[in-house]
Amino acid sequence: MQHARKKFRVGRTSAHNRCMLANMLKSLIHQERIETTLPKAKELRRHADKMITLAKKNTLAARRLAVARLMIRYNKLTSKEARQAKGGDLSVYNVDRKVINKLFDELGSRFVSRNGGYTRILKMQNRVGDNARKCIIEFLAN
């Protein structure tokens, strides 16, 4: 039975779920619209609304909490990122900084007068290969 189970479960480990949701949340903030499956979108909506609520506060503590929730690692590099950084490619840092700045500067100020419901889920046709329910999750215009 699924009584009192609120978490998203798709047969992955909890660490994999956390990383997947953090990456999807970064993509949603960066592009403001992503295409995914319906169960993932419903779970992502919960996290996105919490991040917008943090962005509306616009304090240093809120920024630090957002960095932690998005799993942004400014000081820890993987071996691939270290090779890119030695070559002068700092795009790894720039994208993460753009995501945080966009969250707090654009999205936080856009939804100041709104108390919740910052995202919308639009259902699409099922995927051809496995008949998965596809949808688009996006931030509202204002």
Swiss-Prot record:
**UniProt keyword terms in alphabetical order:** Ribonucleoprotein, Ribosomal protein
- What's a single GO BP term from this record? translation
Top-level taxon: Bacteria
In the UniProt record, which is one GO cellular component term?
cytosolic large ribosomal subunit
PROSITE patterns hit by this protein: RIBOSOMAL_L17
**Disulfides per UniProt:** none
InterPro entries given in the database record: Ribosomal_bL17 (IPR000456), Ribosomal_bL17_CS (IPR047859), Ribosomal_bL17_sf (IPR036373)
This entry's Gene Ontology molecular function terms read: structural constituent of ribosome
For the keyword Ribonucleoprotein, the answer is yes
Does the UniProt entry include the keyword Cytoplasm?
no
Q: How does it assemble?
A: Part of the 50S ribosomal subunit. Contacts protein L32.
The record's comment on protein family reads:
Belongs to the bacterial ribosomal protein bL17 family.
The name this protein carries in UniProt is Large ribosomal subunit protein bL17
